[in-house]
């Protein structure tokens, strides 16, 4: 939801892949290349009409290899090649080099789409870095108070320096304009929640980011967990890239693995609000991206006191260790 975007639309959708599918701009003759190993089912069910290739790395080389042999075009008629990544996402909370991907996408005549949900527009200006189309689920923008799930879609400006036109952005604009999607009518309550969320966005997002850093540092020093993944830690494989891609910090999410315990066991040892609080709200929230039988935990920092959160986590982990 950048003010510098050419245009923006709102959709009612549970998440970004569903929103992209709902737009209807990815057509049966197209190829969609995506790095989204934590969202495989959404791509399998939402884009069964087209050729979907899921890559194992968010690198430009992996996307180029998966695009070989496809004759893509920036003409509105297509066929179109789509490249999809998260600014922060996938198992391990990977941070792709959006600049390199944006350049490579244009060389391959691919329409570069970025899911900016985790970082948000506050934490990553994906269109400045090369995205033709940016989508963002608005849970955190709305502070967890939205009555229904909303996704924002924005198209990059096609006018570049020295009067050059970005053919990818122009194509994305034409496709969005021609999709025939009716304008989403917000209720007065929804409009109020969105307006209040935008007014307080910068302060709240900075708080989310700062608390995530504090909790990541606590977890990295905790012997009861392992493999802490957070782009702000020097141990993260994309740390160097993240410093040039993300803004105001390294996002609100931290991922880690339990030692010989399952995610479900940790959830049982924690107060219920860590699981039931609204996504994007003030309370720190945990999820299990590999399922409750797996051992991976993904933490989304709220605006609550990180010392209290760390203490509750510590007590739960110690309880698990005695079982």
For the regions a protein language model found, what residue spans apply to each?
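Conserved PLP-enzyme active-site core in the AAT-like
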Residues: 2-221
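Conserved C-terminal alpha-helix-loop-beta "cap" of PLP-dependent enzymes
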Residues: 220, 224-322
């Amino acid at each position: 939801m950048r003010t510098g975007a050419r245009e923006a639309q709102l959709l009612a959708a549970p998440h970004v892949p569903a929103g992209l599918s709902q737009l209807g701009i990815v057509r049966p003759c197209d190829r969609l290349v995506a790095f989204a190993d934590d969202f495989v089912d959404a791509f399998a069910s939402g884009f069964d009409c087209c050729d979907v290739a899921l890559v194992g790395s968010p690198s430009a080389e992996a996307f180029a290899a998966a695009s070989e042999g496809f004759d893509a075009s920036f003409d509105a008629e297509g066929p179109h090649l789509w490249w999809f990544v998260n600014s922060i996402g996938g198992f391990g909370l990977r941070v792709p080099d959006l600049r390199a991907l944006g350049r490579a996408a244009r060389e391959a005549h691919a329409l570069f789409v970025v899911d900016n949900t985790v970082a948000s527009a506050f934490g990553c200006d994906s269109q400045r870095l090369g995205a033709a189309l940016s989508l963002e689920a608005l849970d955190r923008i709305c502070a967890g108070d939205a009555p229904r799930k909303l996704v924002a879609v924005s198209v990059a400006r096609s006018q570049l320096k020295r009067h050059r036109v970005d053919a990818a952005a122009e194509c994305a604009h034409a496709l969005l304009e021609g999709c025939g999607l009716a304008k989403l009518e917000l209720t007065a309550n929804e409009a109020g929640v969105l307006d209040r969320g935008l007014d307080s966005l910068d302060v709240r997002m900075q708080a989310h980011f700062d608390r995530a850093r504090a909790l990541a540092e606590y977890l990295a020093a905790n012997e009861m967990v392992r493999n802490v993944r957070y782009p702000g830690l020097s141990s993260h494989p994309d740390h160097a890239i993240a410093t040039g891609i993300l803004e105001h910090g390294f996002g609100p999410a931290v991922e880690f693995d339990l030692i010989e315990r399952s995610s479900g066991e940790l959830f049982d040892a924690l107060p219920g609000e860590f699981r039931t609080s609204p996504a994007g709200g003030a309370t720190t929230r945990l999820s299990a991206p590999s399922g409750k039988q797996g051992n991976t935990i993904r933490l989304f920092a709220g605006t609550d006191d990180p010392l209290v959160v760390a203490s509750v986590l510590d007590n739960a982990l110690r309880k698990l260790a005695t079982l």
